[in-house]
Amino acid sequence: MASQSLIQREQKRKKLEQKYHLIRRSLKKEISKVTSLNEKWEIHGKLQSPPRNSAPTRLHRRCFLTGRPRANYRDFGLSGHILREMVHTCLLPGATRSSW
């Protein structure tokens, strides 16, 4: 189980990313439209002004049961360990155990 501080930090990053999403997108569109190098540098400086944690690359996908940041399946929102346990206890309908 991930510590609560890490989970809270991730939630804070998600809120910041949503808050600054439109600003970042509009600045990136401006950069692509501008041809002058000096103007691009000015816009790039503005793009660096929002907080670092508002960047979408800082977000991690976490298991919603345990908070584990690794081995997550997008379709389920679960980590591999929890997914395997749920399949073994027949809590996920339609999922079958592989055998070869």
Swiss-Prot record:
Compartments in which it is found: Plastid, Chloroplast
The organism's place on the tree of life at top rank: Eukaryota
Entry's Gene Ontology molecular function annotations: rRNA binding; structural constituent of ribosome
The keyword Plastid appears for this protein: yes
Keywords attached to this entry: Chloroplast, Plastid, Ribonucleoprotein, Ribosomal protein, RNA-binding, rRNA-binding
SUPFAM superfamilies in alphabetical order: Glucocorticoid receptor-like (DNA-binding domain) (SSF57716)
Transmembrane parts of this sequence: none
GO biological process, one term: translation
A GO CC term assigned to this protein in UniProt: chloroplast
Keyword Nucleotide-binding: no
Complex and partners: Part of the 30S ribosomal subunit.
Family membership noted in the UniProt record: Belongs to the universal ribosomal protein uS14 family.
Function of the molecule: Binds 16S rRNA, required for the assembly of 30S particles.
Name this protein carries in UniProt: Small ribosomal subunit protein uS14c
Organism listed in the record: Fagopyrum esculentum subsp. ancestrale (Wild buckwheat)
Gene designation: rps14
